Each structure stands twice: as structure tokens, then as C-alpha cells.
Amino acid sequence: TGCPLTVDQQRKFMEYVAKNPFFYHWYPFFVFLLGTGCRIGEAIGIRWDDIDLENRIIDINHSLTYYQRADDSYKCEFRVSLPKTEAGNRRIPMMQQVYDVLQEEYERQKQEGFCVENVDGMTNFVFTNRFGMPHNPAAVNRAIKRIVDTHNSEEEVAAKKEKREPVMIPRFSCHIFRHTFASRFCENETNIKVIQEVMGHADVSTTMNIYAEANPDVTKSVIEKLSKNMDIF
């Protein structure tokens, strides 16, 4: 599905991941995606060097691309790519929830060891799989599918037992996290310039479109508010 998650779907999904011992290891990564609106390549490429816990700032300056090599080996590998536009280079302030998972993750890695995998001279990646490699987007999508399917089959059983309608989570891809963040942001913030900056949109019209989608009734409420404040006819 290409739609952002609703507030309820987002809450349900994250609560399920947080409580499920099989899926919990994905929780910090999903919080990061939903709390920063980063593109998937930016998120898998984030390094501890890009994270300033003291000032609570995330520096977005590159992303990782996972692709098949052109030779006969059919091997896949990561490459570092730099933002296509100046807007892609940005600094995102950390939400409290993002700060908390990063802090926790940092403490855990201090005990268990940091990522030593080297991609184009970069290392120290924050989010890695059990082999110490950065996540590849296809694996993230598989994990989301597994989580959603497991949740939905458990929910179906529970709903039958409790004689109610099941509340399902739709299947979605990792890109939807960014879309969902943008929707929540637009629902809570009216300053388009700020939204554009955090999202790293080169063109403000991209931001405007997302804003309009997230707030279909906004025109009506703006006019209503205006009429309340314009008691001057």
C-alpha cells in the first residue's frame, strides 16, 4: 500500500513490535524511521559520527545504496551515495523517543561492540543485522511483512474469541515510514518551510502536496478560523 499509516495503525504496529520478543530488535530502527522521516538509504547509512546525543542533532549527509554488482558474481553490495541536492544535506533535531532509543542502542553497543563493517571508507553504522552488516531495504521489507502478517493472524484469532471485528494492519513497505512521519508532521505543524527542511525536499511543491493530502479539511477550518477572527464586517 502506498498510503501513510493512520495514527491507530502506527500505534498498533509499534506497540506490537515493542512487546514481541521476536521482533523487538527492530524497534529502535523503526522508531528512528518514524521519528525522523529519513529516507531508507539515509537511515541504514547513519553512523554514530552523524549523531550528536549531547545536542540531540542528527546530521544527514549521505545514504547507502544496496545493489547488484555488474560483474558475473551477482553479488550485492553497499555503496555510499551523497545527496542529489543541497536540501538532502540537513540536520534533524531528535524527538525524545528517538533520543531514548539511540541512547539505549549506544549503551548496548558499548557492551557488545560497534559495527566495524566498512563501506566506501565509512564504518560505525548505528543499525545493523545480526551479522554486523547494515540492513538492506529488502530485508527491512521482509521483516515488516512478517510482523504485519503475524500481528494480523493473532488479531484474527483474538477477535473471534472476543466476538468482535478484527483490527488489521495493512501491509506496507519501509518507504511508508517516511510518508507516515510526513503526515504526522503536517497534521501538527503549519510551517511548510520547516517541514520542507526536515524532510529534505529540494522542491517545496513536494511538501505542499503531502501537506494537502494530510490535511484535506484544512481549507475549511482555516476559513472558519478566519471568519471567527474577522468580526469586522
Where are these regions (language model features)?
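C-terminal secondary-structure termini that scaffold catalytic or DNA-interacting sites
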Residues: 55, 66-89, 96-98, 157-164, ...
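C-terminal catalytic core of Y-nucleophile DNA break-rejoin enzymes
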Residues: 2-6, 59, 68-69, 80-104, ...
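Short, basic (Lys/Arg/His-rich) helix/loop patches that form interaction surfaces
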Residues: 15-26, 92, 108-117, 122-134, ...
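Catalytic-site neighborhood detector that most strongly recognizes the C-terminal catalytic loop/helix
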Residues: 64-66, 99, 180, 199-225
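Basic, Lys/Arg- and aromatic-enriched nucleic-acid-binding interface segment
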Residues: 1-40, 44-46, 53-54, 65, ...
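Ser/Thr-centric signal marking residues that sit
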Residues: 36, 85, 128, 180, ...
